[in-house]
Amino acid sequence: WVTGGYKWLQRTADFDYLQAFIDAGKAEGLDGYAAINTMVGGKECPYGLGSDGPLFDGTAKREWASVVNTSEGLKSCMDMGTGTKFLNPANDEVVEYLLGILEDLAAYDVKGIILDRCRYDDNDLQSDFSEVSRQKFEEFIGKKVENWPDDIFSPGQNSLDNYVTAMQRDWMTFR
């Protein structure tokens, strides 16, 4: 928010924002914490502001984005309009990517690292239903899911009924 309106500010690659905050805090006798939007891969901004984050700048692969079980079928969160785009926590490449970021953060002299949004997508129980999650879930339960994802949740279902099936319990445990 600059001069009464939105303005996209370009960041420079050679300025270390975290170190600048750590230094300023230490000068005032304050401890610093690093916080990361852990499973967030980016944001598609409204109002023509564009997009930001590793899913948009090429750092992350599009296949890393969570897949949502919508009423119209399975959709990548990248194809669902504006808003926050989550990474799939079950994807090994995502985990390795995030561990690299955490390793970088751990090199700073901070009191701690806060893992915000270290969870599945904002779409209630509707994510992640990617092929990666299917394979990992089937390994977890030791059998194939015949009707994916309908054996767990019907298209667009975003809450649990009074009766929770064994497959739903297994899915929630897996997640």
Language model: regions and residue ranges:
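Short, well-ordered coil/turn segments that N-cap beta-strands
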Residues: 26-32, 109-111
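Active-site-adjacent "subsite" loops/lids of carbohydrate-active enzymes
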Residues: 33-108, 156
